[in-house]
Amino acid sequence: MEGIIVRRVIPSDNSCLFNAIGYVMDKDKNKAPELRQVIAAAVASNKEKYNEAFLGKLNEEYCAWILNPDKWGGAIELSILADYYGREIAAYDIQTSRCDLYGQTRNYDERVMLIYDGLHYDALALSPFEGAEEDFDMTIYPVGKDRSIGSIEGLALNLVKDQQRKRSYTDTANFTLRCGVCQIGVIGQKEAVEHAQATGHVNFQEYK
């Protein structure tokens, strides 16, 4: 397979994980409502596995929470979606260049890839050349007997490391944010969460 790995930008609307998955799985950047329903149904159907200790909240609370379009997805949701689609999901973290692979114990024979900057997920695609239309993107890759996707992995890692060199990520432990409601400044994800819980304000902007 020849070409280059490109980052396909997904809108920053609190549903980027779901819409990035929609793009790499179905070439559809508007799958968030449907995929949130899929996740809520999976969690509700297995209360033994998806208990309060696992979810960080009661099963019923989580199901209502994940259906809220303002709530973000993460590892739990990626794991469920890997099983839903029957494909591995590789999520590359720009800051560390680490790859978290979901569904890897299931022996799925295909893989898709996402890239994560600390706050936001975008899709990764194999494009025939720089500037090619998204219609030509390849987003689903066969997994070989060695459980790799061959040269695609190297191309993806090169892109991730290039983004890392450009500091195209957010250090969520130390970034500085300003509340869009009351303009107060906070440092790091922990302080932002505490401020949101105390005030109900959830609109933050990063500033340097």
Swiss-Prot record:
SUPFAM superfamilies for the chain: Cysteine proteinases (SSF54001)
Which ranges carry the OTU domain?
5-127
What this protein catalyses is:
Thiol-dependent hydrolysis of ester, thioester, amide, peptide and isopeptide bonds formed by the C-terminal Gly of ubiquitin (a 76-residue protein attached to proteins as an intracellular targeting signal)
Q: Which Pfam families match?
A: OTU, zf-C2H2_OTU1_C
The answer to whether UniProt assigns keyword Hydrolase to this entry is yes
- Catalytic activity, EC: 3.4.19.12
Where is the catalytic site? D13, C16 (nucleophile), H120, H201
Q: Tell me a GO biological process for this protein.
A: proteolysis
Q: Which keywords belong to this entry?
A: Hydrolase, Protease, Thiol protease, Ubl conjugation pathway
Which PROSITE patterns does the record cross-reference, listed alphabetically?
A: OTU
Tell me where on the tree of life, at the top rank, the source sits.
Eukaryota
Show the GO MF annotations: cysteine-type deubiquitinase activity
| One of the record's GO cellular component terms | nucleus
User: What is this protein's function?
Assistant: Hydrolase that can remove conjugated ubiquitin from proteins in vitro and may therefore play an important regulatory role at the level of protein turnover by preventing degradation. Cysteine protease with a preference for 'Lys-63' and 'Lys-48' -linked ubiquitin (UB) tetramers as substrates.
Which family would the database say this protein is a member of?
Belongs to the peptidase C85 family.
Identification of the protein by name = OVARIAN TUMOR DOMAIN-containing deubiquitinating enzyme 2
Question: Which organism does this record belong to?
Answer: Arabidopsis thaliana
Underlying gene: OTU2
